[in-house]
């Protein structure tokens, strides 16, 4: 049995109550099914038909709009039906059950978009952008996801692939004429110059993709320090709300407290943690263990110190335990008590921000430091969202092109092979060269109905 030949159905609107709910179906030859749903009425392509949706006994389940999009001019490339009824969960479940009764099966997560991909209605980057647009955590991320959905990222990759194909054709032509000297032929065609040009182009795309990945993923910022240095106050200041409990009692925060904010379109996942100290309190010790677990998953660590005490031996011990790979920022808090001036400086190779978490002085400067620490350049125009798998594929293509440069002059066969591998890496991004298990992972993360 051809699994993709099944008619699939799902509720396409978000769970809960609403004014309108949508059931989506996709498959082959859906007009007979549409007639059974509507009591014998036949919808015209791309025209809304107001009708009752009827059960097997002819009783109305609901009334609403029936829309029919015949293949191949539909979202999935197959016949598509949309039932727009009232948005109550019970009604929608009854309508979905009726569709399943008529021979459809329940769609898997992302199966509508997967069929669109398999039917060449969109490439893999555009398909992923559907999920990214739904999951966007800021306006900037949503706009960038829409650019990817409209093909901006794919166009960049296709330009790179086309350039590599031209260079491969040139190189492989030398292999077809063994009487010609390989190196001399490639020098005449400026193959090395063309390789340098495509490497520059790839570096530009990688830089843009990194920015897009920051927009999509955001970053995890963990606040660490001794008890009562102002971690919870700083979290509240960054969030602009009273998220964490603040008292003068050391050890008030005993577990991780999480909050998400958006800075310049970038989602920041801020994690306040238990104060780090030696303790016999069982609950507090569990909180301290969770602090170190959060640090391991962080993108940036803020090490808070009490500005009145400066960096103590206990602070130095915390610093020594932080993973080397992690960007860290020293935050000297409580300048309202020390009389210091708010601002950013570099001391002993560390970025230091002096601020008052309670008064707010210097907090804006810290926000800018956080964006710089994660590599955000603040320019969202022209950005497209990217995923870690995209960055990995581009980096591997970059390595293959570097190897091609090293192979130049040694053997045209080796030079051509590295170009081919680079092209294959880039083609993974758009799905022109992808393993079935990769496709399964990607589409399984979509919501039902997409």
Curated annotation (Swiss-Prot):
Superkingdom field: Bacteria
Residues engaged in binding K(+): 228, 247, 249, 252
UniProt remark on cofactor binding: Binds 1 potassium ion per subunit.
GO aspect biological process, one term: tRNA wobble uridine modification
Record key words, sorted: Cytoplasm, GTP-binding, Hydrolase, Magnesium, Metal-binding, Nucleotide-binding, Potassium, tRNA processing
Molecular function per GO: GTP binding; GTPase activity; metal ion binding
First-tier enzyme category under EC: hydrolase
E.C. number: 3.6.-.-
Matches recorded under PROSITE patterns: G_TRME
Entry binding sites for GTP: 228-233, 247-253, 272-275, 356-358
Binding-site residues, (6S)-5-formyl-5,6,7,8-tetrahydrofolate: 24, 82, 121, 450
Predominant location category: cytoplasm
Ranges where the TrmE-type G domain occurs: 218-375
Residue intervals passing through the bilayer: none
SUPFAM superfamilies tied to this protein: P-loop containing nucleoside triphosphate hydrolases (SSF52540)
Subcellular location per the Swiss-Prot or TrEMBL entry: Cytoplasm
Primary role: Exhibits a very high intrinsic GTPase hydrolysis rate. Involved in the addition of a carboxymethylaminomethyl (cmnm) group at the wobble position (U34) of certain tRNAs, forming tRNA-cmnm(5)s(2)U34.
Family assignment from sequence similarity: Belongs to the TRAFAC class TrmE-Era-EngA-EngB-Septin-like GTPase superfamily. TrmE GTPase family.
Self-association state and partner proteins as the record states: Homodimer. Heterotetramer of two MnmE and two MnmG subunits.
Name listed for the protein in its UniProt record: tRNA modification GTPase MnmE
Organism of derivation: Laribacter hongkongensis (strain HLHK9)
